[in-house]
Amino acid sequence: MILSVCLLLLSLQQSIQASQKPHQVNPDHFIYIENALFHRGCEPHYLVSMNYWGVMNLAADDSAGGNLSRFKTEVKQLSAIGVNNVRIMAASEASGRGTQPFRMYPALMESPGKYNEQIFIGLDRALVEFSKYNISVVMTLNNFWHWSGGYSQYVSWATNNSDIPYPPSWDPEANPPYGDYTTNGSWGNYNASTQAWTGFTGYAGRFYNDTSITHLTQGWFKDHIKTVINRVNTISGVAYKDDPTIMTWELSNEPQDPPLSWITETSEYIKSLAPNHLVTVGFEGKTGEWWFKRVHSPESIDYACGHLWVQNWGHYDPLDSTDKSLIQAEEFATGFLKNLSAWSLDIHKPVVLEEFGMARDEWQNVAKGAPKSFYLYDASATTTHKDRYFQFLLSSVVEYFKNGKAWQGTGPWAYGGIWRPTDKKNAFGQAWAGDPPHEAPGWYDLYDTDPTLKIVAAQAHNASEIIKATSPPGNPSGCRSPRSKKVFANSAGSSYL
């Protein structure tokens, strides 16, 4: 009897010690870069990515506006077509003074340093689910645009003023019942004489340009970075900084004209906290060679990225049913891919096309009465132009990859999955469509039944065949070259001011 009790106590003690034992980090489990190529294990790795930005909310409890069963269904769908990476938001900000329009709700950060644990648990669940399917994750830590709160909310906090000069954004109550864009506000223009932006871009840019508040905005931002990276997943028990499911920490979604000193300070800070993860900027690459190389030049930035938006930038008209506009879009995309390939080769870093998209055949919805008596972005429109554009773009990137010309993956915007524009919004007014709250729902969505997904799947297959053809046979032990990693100092200050 005494022996049995002793054995039971010993077993309990061992169980407690095992549960308290820190998670063992194996650097070989992380995606890394060697000779300007992504690697996973012993092989080159091509990113078949997908933008799926709202998953920390989608995977949250129903009471927090989530839909976990939908999320799990969609992750399974993504895996089935060969997606091996997703880009998501790991940040969203509320005003702390009531609900602001055009953004994600509930927010992860309700006010500086105050977090909604339900949304954090949604992020925990998302990482665990992606891990089951061997899907790696790009964690975006901030946003120049307002649909997640982002820079403008940091500026609002720092100035103690909730009046944000929003640009034209989607108003679901306009043109009932279809919705329309607001007409007030401005995205802003660049004033060459003052060397500053006007409108919303100028306001949001104060996040890292206004020296009267950057000690606050950057301080809060670095606190957020530290909180997220050091978080221990409530489901897996693994700290985010030790989780190989996370491939990359991305500084921000589409920072406009970011100071090099801000990029360097922030990326080095991330590296000091999560040395096994990659870091990138989230830059579009639309402003030319000088900006592209400058933004991606710091040693603490592992790879470059590009965002390609032919309609938003005036190179495609979704109401044109002829080939003229589509050909124009392809010609612009050709030059964009060529330029970023050359610039990335110059700085010896891989590049990923982490955002691009095209609308459905909207001329069909106009014929049905849009925008007055039919929804312009209705899912009933076909995707003939979109499919041709995706086929052209993805095959081009795969060809660059095959020839060692820097491009190493694509990430369409964005996965809407089983959602459709006719679905009702949740109790928080959110659709969790592929399009964020400030844009027309359904504009750039990829639905689970779209033929476009077959093109994404073909890309995955073609890239895999290239890797098989160029990789040595077998999987020899120790095939990975040891990484020479710089140790970045953990700086709590703001040195870029």
Question: What do these predicted regions represent?
Answer:
Residues 9, 13, 83, 99, ...:
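General helical secondary-structure elements
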Residues 467-478:
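Core catalytic subdomain of AMP-forming adenylate-forming
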Residues 1-17:
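Cleavable N-terminal signal peptides of Sec/SRP-targeted secreted and luminal proteins
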Residues 22-315, 326-350, 356-468:
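Active-site mouth of glycoside hydrolases
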Residues 317-320:
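Acidic, serine/threonine/proline-rich low-complexity intrinsically disordered regions
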